[in-house]
From Swiss-Prot:
Superkingdom, natural source: Bacteria
Cofactor note: Binds 2 heme b groups non-covalently.
Keyword Transmembrane helix (UniProt): yes
Record-annotated membrane-spanning stretches: 44-64, 97-117, 124-144, 163-183, 191-211, 245-265, 303-323, 338-358, 368-388
Keywords: Cell membrane, Electron transport, Heme, Iron, Membrane, Metal-binding, Respiratory chain, Transmembrane, Transmembrane helix, Transport
Residues annotated as binding heme b b562: H94, H195
Protein name per its UniProtKB record: Cytochrome b
Location within or outside the cell: Cell membrane
Organism of derivation: Rhodospirillum rubrum
Gene: petB
Keyword Disulfide bond: no
Stored CDD domains: cytochrome_b_C (cd00290), Cytochrome_b_N (cd00284)
Binding residues annotated for heme b b566, in chain numbering: H108, H209
SUPFAM superfamilies: a domain/subunit of cytochrome bc1 complex (Ubiquinol-cytochrome c reductase) (SSF81648), Transmembrane di-heme cytochromes (SSF81342)
Amino acid sequence: MYTPPRWNNKALKWFDERLPVLTVAHKELVVYPAPRNLNYFWNFGSLAGIAMIIMIATGIFLAMSYTAHVDHAFDSVERIMRDVNYGWLMRYMHANGASMFFIVVYVHMFRGLYYGSYKPPREVLWWLGLVILLLMMATAFMGYVLPWGQMSFWGATVITNLFSAIPVVGDDIVTLLWGGFSVDNPTLNRFFSLHYLFPMLLFAVVFLHMWALHVKKSNNPLGIDAKGPFDTIPFHPYYTVKDAFGLGIFLMVFCFFVFFAPNFFGEPDNYIPANPMVTPTHIVPEWYFLPFYAILRAVPDKLGGVLAMFGAILILFVLPWLDTSKVRSATFRPVFKGFFWVFLADCLLLGYLGAMPAEEPYVTITQLATIYYFLHFLVITPLVGWFEKPKPLPVSISSPVTTQA
């Protein structure tokens, strides 16, 4: 039974009686009952929130000095780097913040896959997380176009052209995206407007994601629900301190890239102004799109490649029903655990192959890796759930500790 806080400050008490945001914050962020056995992989959810805030804040400052015009966009970015006070810092924080954002979100997702956080009753929580990923991808792609370098221009041309593979309406969709018959100033204006809008949508979906989390509570490494107060501890101070430690490590890694390797994740060709008459030797997207780009190229047919690429993400929406096992955590599923690590290696291999040229032997290896990606979800996961014999589950979250004691 939750007991509202007693406010010693009369002003706070007066305000909270009329708009109880402080009481809600106290309930959901201070005394919120979290499983007592969460490991450091559960830090990545809060780190994703921090990364999102960094991206929104730096993006707002960059937008103040950016010019969304094909004749001035590249120069405006260079002016931000040279003439705007701390503009170089804002740009490098924003560019590297995108990579950090995707890193923590991908770790967050693979943690969910390993510990079965997509299983009932958290299906909607999982769906909202996938919507967040899709919004991140759309936002990142449009942001990559804004500097209007060679990779920006040709990346926009290649990716938007994929929609032409859609029967009947494909060409009309491409024309709508371009605002004309080629990637030009209307395209840049559209992408800048949407790049500014999508983070607000992202923030709203993150709020729903957290709401769903607090309704059905957190999963945990054992994959079993809390049986009572002995299985939980207050979020503050235990997990706020733990999250603060993780944040310190995250910021050290983030600052290393911002100050010592700001272009580590970037493409040298994007420091060349966009030129529609000169095609780069090797067009590649940002690293966080590479696995899906590899899947796109694995299928010779254009429409088939597009369907495979989008299917690689959309298949995750039905994963709660593809996994037939009653046990959530891979800790107690030895066979599934082995296949999980093979799947992780397959995803890393696809990322590597996505950066390689479309030639042998990379094409054949990419096709095999793509086949395994879909086999993992459509064949291996259901079959393992049916035939695997899991290890015995603990009686409660606290029982492994109390039994040893």
